[in-house]
C-alpha cells in the first residue's frame, strides 16, 4: 500500500527540521462529536469592533496598529482540566493588570476531566469562549479546517508583533492549516513521550522487573497482585482512548511492541513504522492484532483491571491516591514530575518512576508546536483584543507570572531562582499550584520559573534528546502536523467511530468470551460501517 498521507508527513518533517500537555474522554474526539452533530463548518460570526473588520496590505511584519481600547472587553478563556481552589482570587489579580494594560478581563472556564471531549466540542459549537486551549490531541488541525478558529496571520503583524517575535516563524508555521495560522503555541520546547508511570517503591520492594516491555509490565503487575492482592493495579477505562486509533486505555501498552510513526498507530486501524513512514499497512486485519487482543484478554482474566472498566469513569487521581500501581495511557514526563511531587507531599514513602515507550521501541522525538497552544474562537466578541490579551499573557512577565503561579507572597515565592509553593512548604494543600490554571499553552520558555523537580525533568529531556538523535529522522516529529479533511466521508467516519466504541473497546478490554469470534465480528462491522472508504480517502 503506497500512501500519500505519510509521504506528506515526511515532507512536513523536513520543513520542520528546526523543531524545538494530557487527557481523558470517550473514543470520539471533539472533531468527531461535531461531525456526528452534522457540524462540518463553523459559521463566521459578526464582530462589533471596527478594528476586527480592517485588513492590512502590509507584506512584512509591521509595528502594532493603534487599537481603540476605550471600551472594556470581557473575554472567556476556555482551558482543560479542573479549576484551582483560588481561581477567583488569582483571576482578580490577573484582571487588575489586564484592565490596566489592555482594558480587558478574562473569565477562565475549565473543562474538567470528565467527558472533556464532549464539553470541548460543545464549546466550539456554542462559540461561547473567546480564547481556547488547543492541542494536536484535541484535533486542532481538523477543527481549524472546519472553520472553528480565527485566522491570525494578519493580526499577528498588526496587533501582536511582540507575540509573533517571541514565538518565531518556525513554530508558527507548524500551526498552519491550509496555509493559514490559527493558533499560537507556547515557547517552551519539551518532550511529551508517552509511556508508563509506575510505583518504583513497590517494584523495588518485591524485586520486580522495570515495566519496560509487555512481558515485564505483565510480570510487574502479577508480582504486585501476588504480594498485595488487595492493591488495585490499573484503573483503565475508555476515557484516555480518543480519536480513531484505540478504544480502551490498556491498548496503549502495545506501543512497547511497535515502532510506529505515532503512538497507537494511524487512524482507521492503519499503521506505519517510523523508519519507513510511506509504507502503510493494515493492523486491524493482521495476525498481530489477533495476538494482541488475546494478550488483552489474558490481562483482563488475570484481573489487571475491573470487569466494569468499560463503564467506569476516569479517576484522574487514582495513581496519586494509591488506587493503582501504574498508568499506561496519556502519560508524559510532566505528569511523572507531578507524581513525584504528589508522592513527596503525601509523605507515605511512595516513589514514582517512568519509562517512555520510545525507550523500548526506539521512536523518540520532541513535542510538536501544536502540543500546547491557544486559538481565538470563531465568533469571538473582539478578536483583536483577544490577541492583545494573549500577547500580554505570554509576553508580559508580570502577567504571565500571575497566570502561571498565582500571587507572589500568597501562593509562591522564588528562592535562588527556583519556584517555591508556600502552602506546600507549610505542609498544606496548595490552593493555587504551579500552573494552577492548566495553561500549558502559556509557557514562556525564556521566563518559565523552574521547580525543584525540573532538574529531574531536564534529565529526562536530555536522555530523550540523546535517544532521539539516534533515529532515522533525528528528533523530528513527522506525524503531528498532518491534518485530515474528512468532508467526503464524514458519515462513514462517524459509523467507524461507533463500531470502535461498541466492538473494539470490549476487545481491547479483554471482556469477550471468544477473541477470534469477537475479532471477526469487529472486522465485519467495520466493513459494513465503511472502513474501506475511510481508508481510501485518508491515504489519497
Predicted regions and their residues:
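Positively charged n-region of N-terminal signal peptides that target proteins for export
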Residues: 1-10
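C-terminal motif of bacterial Sec signal peptides marking the signal peptidase cleavage site
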Residues: 17-21
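Extracytoplasmic/secretory soluble proteins
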Residues: 9-10, 22-540
Amino acid at each position: 500500500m503506497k500512501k500519500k498521507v505519510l509521504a506528506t508527513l515526511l515532507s512536513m518533517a523536513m520543513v520542520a527540521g528546526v523543531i524545538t500537555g494530557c487527557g481523558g474522554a470517550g473514543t470520539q474526539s471533539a472533531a468527531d462529536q461535531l461531525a456526528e452533530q452534522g457540524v462540518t463548518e463553523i459559521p463566521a460570526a459578526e464582530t462589533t469592533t471596527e478594528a476586527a473588520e480592517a485588513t492590512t496590505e502590509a507584506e512584512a511584519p509591521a509595528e502594532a496598529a493603534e487599537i481603540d481600547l476605550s471600551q472594556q472587553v470581557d473575554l472567556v478563556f476556555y482551558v482543560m482540566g479542573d479549576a484551582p481552589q483560588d481561581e477567583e482570587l488569582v483571576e482578580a489579580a490577573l484582571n487588575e493588570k489586564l484592565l490596566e494594560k489592555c482594558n480587558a478581563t478574562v473569565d477562565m472556564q475549565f473543562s474538567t476531566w470528565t467527558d472533556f471531549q464532549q464539553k470541548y466540542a460543545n464549546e466550539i459549537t456554542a462559540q461561547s469562549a473567546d480564547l481556547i486551549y488547543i492541542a494536536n490531541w484535541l484535533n486542532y488541525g481538523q477543527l481549524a479546517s472546519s472553520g472553528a478558529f480565527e485566522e491570525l496571520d494578519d493580526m499577528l503583524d498588526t496587533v501582536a508583533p511582540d507575540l509573533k517575535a517571541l514565538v518565531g516563524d518556525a513554530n508558527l508555521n507548524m500551526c498552519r492549516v491550509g496555509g493559514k495560522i490559527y493558533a499560537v503555541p507556547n515557547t517552551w520546547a519539551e518532550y511529551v513521550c508517552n509511556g508508563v508511570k509506575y510505583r518504583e517503591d513497590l517494584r523495588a520492594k518485591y524485586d520486580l522487573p522495570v515495566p519496560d516491555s509487555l512481558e515485564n509490565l505483565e510480570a510487574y503487575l502479577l508480582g504486585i497482585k501476588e504480594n498485595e492482592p488487595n492493591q488495585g493495579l490499573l484503573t483503565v477505562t475508555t476515557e484516555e482512548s480518543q480519536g480513531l486509533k484505540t478504544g480502551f486505555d490498556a491498548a496503549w501498552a502495545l506501543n512497547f511492541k511497535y515502532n510506529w510513526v505515532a503512538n497507537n498507530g494511524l487512524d482507521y486501524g492503519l499503521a506505519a513504522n517510523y523508519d519507513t513512514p510511506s509504507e502503510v499497512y493494515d493492523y486491524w486485519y493482521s495476525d498481530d492484532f489477533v495476538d494482541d487482543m488475546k494478550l488483552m484478554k489474558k490481562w483482563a482474566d488475570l484481573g489487571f483491571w475491573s470487569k466494569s472498566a468499560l463503564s467506569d469513569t476516569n479517576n484522574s487521581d487514582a495513581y496519586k491516591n494509591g488506587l493503582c500501581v501504574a498508568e499506561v495511557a496519556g502519560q508524559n514526563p510532566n505528569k511523572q514530575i507531578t507524581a513525584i511531587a504528589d508522592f513527596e507531599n503525601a509523605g507515605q514513602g511512595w516513589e514514582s518512576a517512568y519509562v517512555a515507550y520510545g525507550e523500548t521501541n526506539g521512536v523518540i522525538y520532541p513535542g510538536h508546536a501544536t502540543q500546547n497552544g491557544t486559538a481565538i474562537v470563531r465568533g469571538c466578541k473582539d478578536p483583536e483584543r483577544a490577541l492583545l490579551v494573549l500577547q500580554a499573557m505570554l509576553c508580559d512577565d508580570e502577567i504571565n507570572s500571575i497566570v502561571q503561579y498565582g500571587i507572589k507572597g500568597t501562593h509562591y515565592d522564588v528562592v535562588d531562582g527556583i519556584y517555591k509553593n508556600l502552602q506546600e512548604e507549610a505542609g498544606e494543600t496548595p490552593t493555587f499550584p504551579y500552573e494552577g490554571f492548566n495553561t500549558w499553552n502559556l509557557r514562556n520558555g525564556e521566563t518559565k520559573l523552574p521547580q525543584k523537580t525540573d532538574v529531574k525533568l531536564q534529565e529526562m529531556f536530555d536522555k530523550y534528546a540523546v535517544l532521539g538523535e539516534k533515529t532515522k529522522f533525528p528528533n523530528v516529529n513527522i506525524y503531528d502536523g498532518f491534518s485530515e479533511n474528512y468532508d467526503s466521508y464524514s458519515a462513514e467516519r462517524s459509523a467507524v467511530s461507533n463500531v470502535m466504541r461498541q466492538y473494539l473497546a470490549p476487545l481491547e478490554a479483554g471482556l469477550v468470551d471468544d477473541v477470534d469470534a469477537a475479532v471477526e465480528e469487529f472486522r465485519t462491522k467495520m466493513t459494513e460501517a465503511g472502513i474501506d472508504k475511510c481508508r481510501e480517502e485518508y491515504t489519497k
